[in-house]
Amino acid sequence: MARSCIKENRARNVCTIGLGGGSGREGTARIIADQSGGNLKMWAYFLKRLGLSIAIIAVAMSILFVITHMIPGDPVSIALGPRATTSMKEEYRARMGIDLPVYIQYGRFVSNVLQGNLGQDVFSGLSVLDIVKRQLPHTVVLVCVAIGWSATLGIILGCFSAVRRNSILDRIIGVITVGAIAIPSFVVSLYALLIFAVTLRVLPALGAGESGDIIDQLKHLVLPGFALGLGWVGYIARLVRASMLEVMGENFIRAARAYGLPERKIIARYALKIAIVPTVTLLGVGIGNMLSGALFAEIVFARPGIGKLIYDMVLMRNYPVVQGAVLVTTALFVVSALIADMVNSYLDPRVRANL
Protein backbone atom coordinates (compact mmCIF):
# COMPACT_ATOMS: atom_id res chain seq x y z
CA MET A 1 0.00 0.00 0.00
CA ALA A 2 2.78 2.42 0.91
CA ARG A 3 4.64 1.71 -2.30
CA SER A 4 1.56 2.26 -4.49
CA CYS A 5 0.70 5.54 -2.78
CA ILE A 6 4.26 6.76 -3.20
CA LYS A 7 4.24 5.89 -6.91
CA GLU A 8 0.87 7.61 -7.35
CA ASN A 9 2.13 10.72 -5.59
CA ARG A 10 5.41 10.68 -7.51
CA ALA A 11 3.66 10.48 -10.87
CA ARG A 12 1.16 13.12 -9.70
CA ASN A 13 -1.78 11.06 -10.83
CA VAL A 14 -5.30 11.72 -9.61
CA CYS A 15 -6.52 8.96 -7.31
CA THR A 16 -10.04 7.84 -8.23
CA ILE A 17 -10.56 5.63 -5.18
CA GLY A 18 -13.30 6.84 -2.89
CA LEU A 19 -14.69 9.52 -5.22
CA GLY A 20 -18.39 9.87 -4.60
CA GLY A 21 -20.62 8.86 -7.47
CA GLY A 22 -17.79 7.50 -9.60
CA SER A 23 -17.68 3.95 -10.87
CA GLY A 24 -14.65 1.81 -11.61
CA ARG A 25 -15.37 1.89 -15.34
CA GLU A 26 -15.52 5.69 -15.33
CA GLY A 27 -12.18 5.84 -13.55
CA THR A 28 -10.64 3.38 -16.00
CA ALA A 29 -11.96 5.34 -18.97
CA ARG A 30 -10.56 8.54 -17.53
CA ILE A 31 -7.12 6.95 -17.05
CA ILE A 32 -7.12 5.63 -20.65
CA ALA A 33 -8.12 9.05 -21.95
CA ASP A 34 -5.37 10.72 -19.95
CA GLN A 35 -2.80 8.24 -21.27
CA SER A 36 -3.94 8.76 -24.88
CA GLY A 37 -3.77 12.52 -24.48
CA GLY A 38 -0.31 12.22 -22.95
CA ASN A 39 0.90 10.08 -25.86
CA LEU A 40 -0.40 12.62 -28.37
CA LYS A 41 1.36 15.41 -26.50
CA MET A 42 4.59 13.41 -26.50
CA TRP A 43 4.37 12.82 -30.26
CA ALA A 44 3.62 16.49 -30.89
CA TYR A 45 6.56 17.49 -28.72
CA PHE A 46 8.82 15.01 -30.52
CA LEU A 47 7.83 16.33 -33.96
CA LYS A 48 8.39 19.89 -32.79
CA ARG A 49 11.85 19.06 -31.47
CA LEU A 50 12.66 17.06 -34.61
CA GLY A 51 11.74 20.01 -36.82
CA LEU A 52 13.87 22.32 -34.69
CA SER A 53 16.81 19.91 -34.93
CA ILE A 54 16.53 19.75 -38.72
CA ALA A 55 16.43 23.55 -38.86
CA ILE A 56 19.57 23.78 -36.70
CA ILE A 57 21.44 21.36 -38.96
CA ALA A 58 20.31 23.33 -42.04
CA VAL A 59 21.55 26.61 -40.55
CA ALA A 60 24.82 24.94 -39.54
CA MET A 61 25.27 23.69 -43.12
CA SER A 62 24.81 27.21 -44.48
CA ILE A 63 27.21 28.77 -41.98
CA LEU A 64 29.77 26.04 -42.63
CA PHE A 65 29.58 26.59 -46.40
CA VAL A 66 30.08 30.36 -46.02
CA ILE A 67 32.97 30.05 -43.57
CA THR A 68 34.89 27.51 -45.65
CA HIS A 69 34.60 29.74 -48.72
CA MET A 70 35.83 32.77 -46.75
CA ILE A 71 39.00 31.06 -45.51
CA PRO A 72 42.04 32.50 -47.31
CA GLY A 73 44.02 30.19 -49.57
CA ASP A 74 43.44 28.47 -52.89
CA PRO A 75 42.53 24.78 -52.45
CA VAL A 76 43.30 24.14 -56.13
CA SER A 77 46.88 25.41 -55.82
CA ILE A 78 47.32 23.41 -52.64
CA ALA A 79 45.92 20.24 -54.21
CA LEU A 80 47.92 20.41 -57.46
CA GLY A 81 51.11 21.92 -56.08
CA PRO A 82 53.20 24.92 -57.20
CA ARG A 83 54.16 23.36 -60.55
CA ALA A 84 50.60 23.09 -61.84
CA THR A 85 49.89 24.98 -65.04
CA THR A 86 46.94 27.32 -65.57
CA SER A 87 45.16 24.79 -67.79
CA MET A 88 45.56 22.09 -65.15
CA LYS A 89 44.07 24.40 -62.52
CA GLU A 90 41.13 25.32 -64.73
CA GLU A 91 40.45 21.68 -65.51
CA TYR A 92 40.55 20.83 -61.81
CA ARG A 93 38.21 23.72 -60.95
CA ALA A 94 35.74 22.55 -63.59
CA ARG A 95 35.90 18.95 -62.35
CA MET A 96 35.33 19.98 -58.72
CA GLY A 97 32.70 22.60 -59.62
CA ILE A 98 34.68 25.42 -57.99
CA ASP A 99 34.37 27.62 -61.08
CA LEU A 100 30.58 27.78 -60.77
CA PRO A 101 28.71 30.68 -59.10
CA VAL A 102 28.51 30.47 -55.32
CA TYR A 103 24.75 29.90 -55.19
CA ILE A 104 25.06 26.94 -57.59
CA GLN A 105 27.90 25.52 -55.48
CA TYR A 106 25.70 25.88 -52.40
CA GLY A 107 22.79 24.13 -54.11
CA ARG A 108 25.05 21.26 -55.15
CA PHE A 109 26.49 21.08 -51.64
CA VAL A 110 23.04 20.77 -50.05
CA SER A 111 21.89 18.27 -52.68
CA ASN A 112 24.98 16.11 -52.21
CA VAL A 113 24.63 16.16 -48.41
CA LEU A 114 21.01 15.04 -48.64
CA GLN A 115 22.19 12.13 -50.81
CA GLY A 116 24.92 11.20 -48.32
CA ASN A 117 27.73 12.55 -50.49
CA LEU A 118 30.06 14.83 -48.50
CA GLY A 119 32.49 15.41 -51.36
CA GLN A 120 36.00 14.21 -52.18
CA ASP A 121 39.40 14.72 -50.61
CA VAL A 122 41.25 17.27 -52.76
CA PHE A 123 44.51 15.33 -52.41
CA SER A 124 43.61 11.65 -52.63
CA GLY A 125 40.22 11.86 -54.32
CA LEU A 126 38.76 9.53 -51.68
CA SER A 127 35.22 9.97 -50.45
CA VAL A 128 35.01 12.35 -47.48
CA LEU A 129 32.34 10.14 -45.93
CA ASP A 130 34.69 7.14 -46.00
CA ILE A 131 37.48 9.20 -44.41
CA VAL A 132 35.17 10.43 -41.65
CA LYS A 133 33.79 6.92 -41.05
CA ARG A 134 37.33 5.61 -40.47
CA GLN A 135 38.14 8.28 -37.87
CA LEU A 136 34.79 8.69 -36.13
CA PRO A 137 34.80 5.38 -34.16
CA HIS A 138 37.99 6.42 -32.33
CA THR A 139 36.34 9.62 -31.14
CA VAL A 140 33.06 7.89 -30.26
CA VAL A 141 34.88 5.33 -28.09
CA LEU A 142 36.85 8.09 -26.36
CA VAL A 143 33.68 10.10 -25.67
CA CYS A 144 31.85 7.01 -24.36
CA VAL A 145 34.68 6.23 -21.95
CA ALA A 146 34.84 9.84 -20.76
CA ILE A 147 31.08 10.21 -20.33
CA GLY A 148 30.80 6.79 -18.66
CA TRP A 149 33.29 7.30 -15.85
CA SER A 150 32.46 10.98 -15.32
CA ALA A 151 28.70 10.30 -15.07
CA THR A 152 29.21 7.40 -12.65
CA LEU A 153 31.54 9.30 -10.33
CA GLY A 154 29.56 12.53 -10.64
CA ILE A 155 26.28 10.86 -9.64
CA ILE A 156 27.93 9.17 -6.65
CA LEU A 157 29.57 12.40 -5.44
CA GLY A 158 26.40 14.42 -5.99
CA CYS A 159 24.31 11.91 -4.07
CA PHE A 160 26.70 11.80 -1.11
CA SER A 161 26.94 15.58 -1.11
CA ALA A 162 23.15 15.97 -0.97
CA VAL A 163 22.65 13.33 1.71
CA ARG A 164 25.42 14.87 3.85
CA ARG A 165 24.31 18.44 3.21
CA ASN A 166 26.40 21.16 4.93
CA SER A 167 28.77 18.55 6.37
CA ILE A 168 32.55 18.48 5.97
CA LEU A 169 32.16 15.82 3.26
CA ASP A 170 29.75 18.09 1.38
CA ARG A 171 32.23 20.97 1.48
CA ILE A 172 35.15 18.80 0.38
CA ILE A 173 33.14 17.43 -2.54
CA GLY A 174 32.09 20.98 -3.41
CA VAL A 175 35.70 22.17 -3.57
CA ILE A 176 36.75 19.15 -5.67
CA THR A 177 33.89 19.50 -8.14
CA VAL A 178 34.33 23.26 -8.59
CA GLY A 179 38.05 22.70 -9.14
CA ALA A 180 37.31 20.01 -11.73
CA ILE A 181 35.02 22.41 -13.59
CA ALA A 182 37.53 25.26 -13.50
CA ILE A 183 40.50 23.38 -15.00
CA PRO A 184 40.44 23.34 -18.84
CA SER A 185 40.63 19.93 -20.49
CA PHE A 186 43.78 20.77 -22.46
CA VAL A 187 45.58 21.67 -19.20
CA VAL A 188 44.47 18.36 -17.69
CA SER A 189 45.71 16.59 -20.82
CA LEU A 190 49.17 18.15 -20.62
CA TYR A 191 49.64 17.48 -16.90
CA ALA A 192 48.26 13.94 -17.16
CA LEU A 193 50.71 13.24 -19.98
CA LEU A 194 53.60 14.75 -18.02
CA ILE A 195 52.85 12.96 -14.74
CA PHE A 196 51.60 9.51 -15.71
CA ALA A 197 53.33 8.94 -19.06
CA VAL A 198 56.60 10.88 -18.84
CA THR A 199 57.46 10.98 -15.13
CA LEU A 200 55.87 7.83 -13.66
CA ARG A 201 55.71 5.90 -16.96
CA VAL A 202 52.75 3.84 -15.81
CA LEU A 203 50.55 4.57 -18.84
CA PRO A 204 51.25 4.90 -22.57
CA ALA A 205 51.60 8.42 -23.90
CA LEU A 206 50.67 8.48 -27.58
CA GLY A 207 48.51 6.68 -30.10
CA ALA A 208 45.46 4.44 -29.83
CA GLY A 209 47.19 1.12 -29.16
CA GLU A 210 47.86 -1.95 -31.24
CA SER A 211 45.05 -3.02 -33.54
CA GLY A 212 43.38 -6.15 -32.17
CA ASP A 213 44.95 -5.82 -28.70
CA ILE A 214 42.00 -4.76 -26.50
CA ILE A 215 44.10 -4.41 -23.34
CA ASP A 216 46.60 -2.12 -25.04
CA GLN A 217 43.79 -0.03 -26.55
CA LEU A 218 42.15 0.34 -23.13
CA LYS A 219 45.44 1.50 -21.63
CA HIS A 220 45.72 4.16 -24.34
CA LEU A 221 42.19 5.32 -23.48
CA VAL A 222 42.88 6.00 -19.79
CA LEU A 223 44.70 9.34 -20.02
CA PRO A 224 42.64 10.99 -22.79
CA GLY A 225 39.41 9.67 -21.25
CA PHE A 226 40.43 11.07 -17.86
CA ALA A 227 41.36 14.45 -19.31
CA LEU A 228 38.17 14.71 -21.34
CA GLY A 229 35.78 13.66 -18.58
CA LEU A 230 37.24 15.33 -15.48
CA GLY A 231 35.38 18.61 -15.90
CA TRP A 232 32.07 16.83 -16.40
CA VAL A 233 32.43 15.10 -13.04
CA GLY A 234 32.00 18.52 -11.47
CA TYR A 235 29.03 19.51 -13.64
CA ILE A 236 27.18 16.26 -13.03
CA ALA A 237 27.91 16.20 -9.29
CA ARG A 238 26.64 19.76 -8.80
CA LEU A 239 23.51 19.05 -10.84
CA VAL A 240 22.73 15.79 -9.02
CA ARG A 241 23.24 17.48 -5.64
CA ALA A 242 20.84 20.31 -6.47
CA SER A 243 18.29 17.92 -7.96
CA MET A 244 18.53 15.56 -4.98
CA LEU A 245 17.92 18.39 -2.52
CA GLU A 246 14.86 19.45 -4.50
CA VAL A 247 13.46 15.92 -4.72
CA MET A 248 14.06 15.25 -1.02
CA GLY A 249 11.55 18.01 -0.26
CA GLU A 250 8.79 16.50 -2.42
CA ASN A 251 5.56 15.19 -0.89
CA PHE A 252 6.13 11.57 -1.92
CA ILE A 253 9.42 11.54 0.02
CA ARG A 254 7.60 12.81 3.11
CA ALA A 255 4.96 10.14 2.54
CA ALA A 256 7.63 7.44 2.32
CA ARG A 257 9.15 8.59 5.60
CA ALA A 258 5.72 8.72 7.22
CA TYR A 259 5.14 5.08 6.23
CA GLY A 260 8.40 4.17 7.94
CA LEU A 261 10.50 3.17 4.93
CA PRO A 262 14.26 3.09 5.61
CA GLU A 263 16.07 6.29 4.63
CA ARG A 264 18.58 4.39 2.50
CA LYS A 265 15.76 2.76 0.52
CA ILE A 266 14.01 6.12 0.07
CA ILE A 267 17.17 7.69 -1.33
CA ALA A 268 18.23 4.82 -3.60
CA ARG A 269 14.83 3.69 -4.84
CA TYR A 270 12.82 6.87 -5.08
CA ALA A 271 14.81 10.09 -4.72
CA LEU A 272 17.84 9.17 -6.82
CA LYS A 273 15.73 7.81 -9.68
CA ILE A 274 14.13 11.21 -10.21
CA ALA A 275 17.19 13.26 -9.26
CA ILE A 276 19.32 11.81 -12.06
CA VAL A 277 16.72 12.54 -14.75
CA PRO A 278 18.05 16.09 -15.43
CA THR A 279 21.47 14.50 -15.81
CA VAL A 280 20.21 12.81 -18.98
CA THR A 281 19.72 16.21 -20.62
CA LEU A 282 23.13 17.37 -19.42
CA LEU A 283 24.74 14.23 -20.84
CA GLY A 284 23.10 14.91 -24.19
CA VAL A 285 24.72 18.34 -24.29
CA GLY A 286 27.90 16.91 -22.79
CA ILE A 287 28.32 14.39 -25.59
CA GLY A 288 28.27 17.21 -28.13
CA ASN A 289 30.73 19.28 -26.14
CA MET A 290 33.00 16.29 -25.70
CA LEU A 291 33.03 15.72 -29.44
CA SER A 292 34.53 19.19 -29.82
CA GLY A 293 36.65 18.88 -26.68
CA ALA A 294 38.13 15.63 -27.97
CA LEU A 295 40.17 17.78 -30.36
CA PHE A 296 42.62 18.75 -27.62
CA ALA A 297 42.91 15.23 -26.23
CA GLU A 298 43.50 13.76 -29.68
CA ILE A 299 46.17 16.35 -30.49
CA VAL A 300 47.99 16.07 -27.16
CA PHE A 301 47.93 12.26 -27.10
CA ALA A 302 48.34 11.89 -30.90
CA ARG A 303 45.19 9.79 -31.15
CA PRO A 304 43.33 9.26 -34.41
CA GLY A 305 39.86 10.74 -34.37
CA ILE A 306 37.48 13.25 -35.87
CA GLY A 307 38.97 16.17 -33.93
CA LYS A 308 42.52 15.54 -35.07
CA LEU A 309 41.24 14.97 -38.60
CA ILE A 310 39.64 18.44 -38.64
CA TYR A 311 42.79 20.00 -37.20
CA ASP A 312 45.07 18.38 -39.79
CA MET A 313 42.77 19.18 -42.70
CA VAL A 314 42.47 22.85 -41.68
CA LEU A 315 46.27 23.14 -41.76
CA MET A 316 46.30 21.50 -45.20
CA ARG A 317 43.40 23.68 -46.49
CA ASN A 318 41.52 20.50 -47.38
CA TYR A 319 38.10 22.17 -47.27
CA PRO A 320 35.83 19.27 -48.35
CA VAL A 321 37.09 17.07 -45.51
CA VAL A 322 36.74 19.93 -43.03
CA GLN A 323 33.19 20.56 -44.19
CA GLY A 324 32.21 16.91 -43.98
CA ALA A 325 33.81 16.27 -40.59
CA VAL A 326 32.34 19.39 -38.98
CA LEU A 327 28.92 18.64 -40.45
CA VAL A 328 28.94 15.09 -39.08
CA THR A 329 30.03 16.37 -35.66
CA THR A 330 27.26 18.97 -35.67
CA ALA A 331 24.67 16.37 -36.63
CA LEU A 332 25.82 14.08 -33.81
CA PHE A 333 25.58 16.96 -31.34
CA VAL A 334 22.03 17.83 -32.41
CA VAL A 335 20.88 14.19 -32.45
CA SER A 336 22.35 13.48 -29.00
CA ALA A 337 20.62 16.56 -27.58
CA LEU A 338 17.31 15.49 -29.19
CA ILE A 339 17.54 11.95 -27.81
CA ALA A 340 18.43 13.22 -24.33
CA ASP A 341 15.52 15.67 -24.39
CA MET A 342 13.05 12.98 -25.40
CA VAL A 343 14.34 10.50 -22.81
CA ASN A 344 14.10 13.21 -20.16
CA SER A 345 10.50 13.95 -21.17
CA TYR A 346 9.64 10.25 -21.05
CA LEU A 347 11.23 9.55 -17.67
CA ASP A 348 10.13 12.61 -15.71
CA PRO A 349 6.35 12.85 -15.09
CA ARG A 350 6.75 16.53 -14.16
CA VAL A 351 8.08 17.32 -17.64
CA ARG A 352 5.28 15.35 -19.32
CA ALA A 353 2.70 17.26 -17.28
CA ASN A 354 3.98 20.56 -18.67
CA LEU A 355 3.99 19.53 -22.34
Residue spans for each PLM region:
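Hydrophobic alpha-helical transmembrane segments of membrane transport/permease proteins
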Residues: 57-107, 200-220
